[in-house]
């Protein structure tokens, strides 16, 4: 089966990762020790995508847990599903990265990276046909951002033809954990643009908004946020984990979603939104799911797609859903909102179906969109970056670890380029292109 190796780095990555494994273990009928006691053949059919089968009907996640300090790892190990993971797959340092990207990427992280790669290699060798890697991390810190991107580039070197998907928590406009977040995030995006095949952008602020506005939680905890993220991750990976009519793998997803190699940053959404522990007793219908899924309030990244246009998007429906109904709804959305879709990619909504719904829901849908409005997110981080970098504030923390100012300048301009590329395709129409060609045709002068 087409296996995926999962890595989680840093505090954020490990917490999201732990929530993800808890969610999919439940969906596949595994208890907290990885013992199968499910009811459906379908749960077992593609179990091997994420789990290794060990002796005694026990399944072990193909996961590598990485951090530069032992704290979060201990918490995961002590958590409800801590016994699920293979003990050798916990790789951690003692020093911490102190929210410093340079420590994660160049000094502390670089010392630990070979140990991690050994574990990754061992996991990859245990696969029949590895399709790729997925990594959960945040872009604002030191370990997830710095060491996470280091791992991505190292894995890229060693497995150049395998897919690399990242679930990246991007800094949010209002909620900031550290002052140097814009630095860390910009340096990370600089890496992701080059080395990742698909990046699912998740944003704490958007998650807070969903918790407060939609789920009416007065003070959401990180547990509530991680629950939302794990719902989306479970949805995005559904097609990989269960047999379905329209199945996809990481590569098919990328082929359908990425029209230009650098523009692989996706917004994600999920419907119906329910809070942790609350079951939705209301029956949901396909039209409702579709409407909710395309609602900007449901997006888990703080950028509003109405300020841009969709290059491509993909919807994954789960549960007992009629294919015909889904296709009608999708066509409906596209016709009604045609101004939000670029007209030079016809039929740019792709749908997939899976018969197995998430736990406690009759049906659900997950949305993945490649929208030019994601540039708002990069713009915002870029502006904060420039404000600090112009004064060279906090730079000594990075140069002290051996970084060069030049690298900051490069990262800044790469991010600005990314923003203008999104803008360029947002403005592009069909007719403009043709006019340009007509103008260029009659030029016969020899080139100097």
UniProtKB/Swiss-Prot annotation:
The keyword Iron does not apply. Residues 429-448 have a biased composition (Acidic residues). GO terms for biological process: microtubule-based process. Its cofactor is Mg(2+). GTP binds at residues 11, 69, 138, 142-144, 204, 226. It is found in: Cytoplasm, Cytoskeleton. Keywords: Cytoplasm, Cytoskeleton, GTP-binding, Magnesium, Metal-binding, Microtubule, Nucleotide-binding. Mg(2+) binds at residue 69. Its main location: cytoplasm. It comes from the Eukaryota. Coiled coil: none annotated. InterPro entries: Beta-tubulin_BS, Beta_tubulin, Tub_FtsZ_C, Tubulin, Tubulin/FtsZ-like_C, Tubulin/FtsZ_2-layer-sand-dom, Tubulin/FtsZ_GTPase_sf, Tubulin_C. Residues 426-448 are annotated as: Disordered. GO terms for molecular function: GTP binding; GTPase activity; metal ion binding; structural constituent of cytoskeleton. It holds the Pfam family Tubulin. PANTHER family: TUBULIN. This is Tubulin beta chain. It comes from Epichloe coenophiala. The gene is TUB2.
């Amino acid at each position: 089966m087409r296996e995926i190796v999962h890595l989680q780095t840093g505090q954020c990555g490990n917490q999201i990762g732990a929530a993800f494994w808890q969610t999919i273990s439940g969906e596949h009928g595994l208890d907290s020790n990885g013992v199968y006691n499910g009811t459906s053949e379908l749960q077992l059919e593609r179990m091997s995508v994420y789990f290794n089968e060990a002796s005694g009907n026990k399944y072990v996640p193909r996961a590598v847990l990485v951090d530069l300090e032992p704290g979060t790892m201990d918490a995961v190990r002590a958590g409800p599903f801590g016994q699920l993971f293979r003990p050798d797959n916990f790789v951690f340092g003692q020093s911490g990265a102190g929210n410093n990207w340079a420590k994660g990427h160049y000094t502390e992280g670089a010392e630990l990276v070979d140990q991690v790669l050994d574990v990754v290699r061992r996991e990859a060798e245990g696969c029949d046909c590895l399709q790729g890697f997925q990594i959960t991390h945040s872009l604002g810190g030191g370990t997830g951002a710095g060491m996470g991107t280091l791992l991505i580039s190292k894995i890229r070197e060693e497995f150049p033809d395998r897919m690399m998907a990242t679930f990246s928590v991007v800094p949010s406009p209002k909620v900031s954990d550290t002052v140097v977040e814009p630095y860390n995030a910009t340096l990370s995006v600089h890496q992701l643009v080059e080395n990742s095949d698909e990046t699912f952008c998740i944003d704490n602020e958007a998650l807070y908004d969903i918790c407060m506005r939609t789920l009416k939680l007065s003070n959401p905890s990180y547990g509530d946020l991680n629950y939302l993220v794990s719902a989306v991750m479970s949805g995005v990976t559904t097609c990989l984990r269960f047999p379905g009519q329209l199945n996809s793998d990481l590569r098919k997803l990328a082929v359908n979603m990425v029209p230009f190699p650098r523009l692989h940053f996706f917004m994600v959404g999920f419907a119906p939104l329910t809070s942790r522990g609350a079951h939705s007793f209301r029956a949901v219908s396909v039209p409702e799911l579709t409407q909710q899924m395309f609602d900007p309030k449901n997006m888990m990244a703080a950028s509003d797609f109405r300020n841009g246009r969709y290059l491509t998007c993909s919807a994954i429906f789960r549960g007992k859903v009629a294919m015909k109904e889904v296709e009608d709804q999708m066509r409906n959305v596209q016709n009604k909102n045609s101004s939000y879709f670029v007209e030079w990619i016809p039929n740019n909504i792709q749908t997939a179906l899976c018969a197995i719904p998430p736990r406690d829901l009759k049906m659900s849908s997950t949305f993945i969109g490649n929208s030019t409005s994601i540039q708002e997110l990069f713009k915002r981080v870029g502006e904060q970056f420039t404000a600090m970098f112009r004064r060279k504030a906090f730079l000594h923390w990075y140069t002290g670890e051996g970084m060069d100012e030049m690298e900051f300048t490069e990262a800044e301009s790469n991010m600005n380029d990314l923003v203008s590329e999104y803008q360029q395709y947002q403005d592009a129409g069909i007719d403009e292109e043709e006019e340009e060609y007509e103008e260029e045709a009659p030029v016969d002068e020899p080139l100097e």
